[in-house]
């Protein structure tokens, strides 16, 4: 092992912890002088995570991670290249990299991301199997709180149809977190479980952007559970009079309401894996 590389790598990660992005970039680049593919991968992952805050970050991320992959098929490098491919809409390429990584290293995050790729490719059966397995690993807290994903039960529910989707909704409902409220209401609407969504509508219209689809989902639920109408309308302040009027209009137009409620389909966000090689995994 190149001690010089590990030293620079540690300094880079410490700089990141301090929020010193420029020093982290310099140290990651210095680590790459060693020629170790893990150093190349770390630099690429740094650029990916920095996004537009660092000049030419997308091209740099692609260059360094691809360079690392040419010399190592380590599961972490494979997951890094998979995420780049996913962000570019190359679901097939991302899936291939994740499947190769999965042969060497299994984890709930990897399983979940396999499901996301299958979902993107339209293979809902394969996606459902992955989400079900990730859920069985009791990894929901890890996926949602640390990785930016959604509960695997929620993702699974959108992969199945009919009675199984309704059953999946009921299994998921007690586990719902606040960040998944919009998706939960969408799932309720698709399952025609309007009574399940009705109690959370005030929270929805108070905390989420009042897009056409949000208003349409709300109206659709209120059409079936009219007792909640006044409670929901009280959530609209004077500054939101236009949105309130739009909601009232949609309540009287069932066709437009149904069309708008289905305008943006659900798509599970990928889980952000641990992309850096740290001292613990060297």
Q: Where on the chain are the PLM-derived regions?
A:
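Terminal, low-structured helical/coil segments at or just beyond the last alpha-helical repeat
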Residues: 1-5, 144-147, 180, 231-282
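Structural signature of tandem alpha-helical TPR/SEL1-like repeats
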Residues: 17-27, 51-67, 88-100, 121-133, ...
């Amino acid at each position: 092992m190149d001690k010089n590389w590990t030293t620079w790598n540690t300094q880079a990660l410490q700089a990141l912890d301090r929020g010193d992005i420029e020093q982290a970039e310099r140290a990651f680049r210095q680590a790459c002088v060693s020629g170790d593919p893990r150093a190349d991968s770390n630099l690429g992952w740094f650029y990916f995570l920095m996004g537009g805050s660092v000049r030419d970050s997308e091209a740099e991320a692609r260059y360094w991670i691809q360079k690392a992959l040419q010399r190592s098929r380590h599961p972490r490098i494979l997951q890094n290249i998979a995420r780049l491919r996913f962000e570019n809409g190359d679901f097939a390429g991302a899936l291939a990299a994740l499947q190769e990584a999965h042969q060497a290293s299994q984890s709930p995050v990897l399983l979940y991301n396999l499901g996301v790729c299958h979902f993107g490719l339209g293979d809902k059966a394969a996606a459902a199997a992955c989400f079900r397995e990730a859920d069985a690993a009791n990894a929901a807290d890890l996926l949602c709180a640390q990785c930016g994903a959604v509960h695997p039960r929620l993702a699974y529910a959108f992969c199945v149809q009919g009675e199984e989707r309704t059953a999946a909704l009921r299994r998921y409902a007690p586990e719902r977190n606040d960040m998944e409220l919009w998706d939960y209401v969408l799932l309720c609407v698709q399952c025609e479980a309007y009574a399940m969504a009705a109690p959370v509508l005030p929270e929805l219209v108070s905390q989420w952007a009042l897009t056409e689809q949000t208003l349409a989902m709300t109206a659709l639920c209120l059409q079936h559970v009219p007792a909640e109408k006044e409670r929901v309308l009280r959530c609209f302040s004077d500054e939101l009079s236009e949105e309130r009027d739009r909601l009232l209009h949609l309540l009287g137009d069932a066709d437009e309401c149904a069309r708008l409620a289905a305008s943006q389909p659900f798509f599970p966000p990928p889980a952000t894996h641990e992309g850096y090689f740290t001292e613990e995994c060297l």
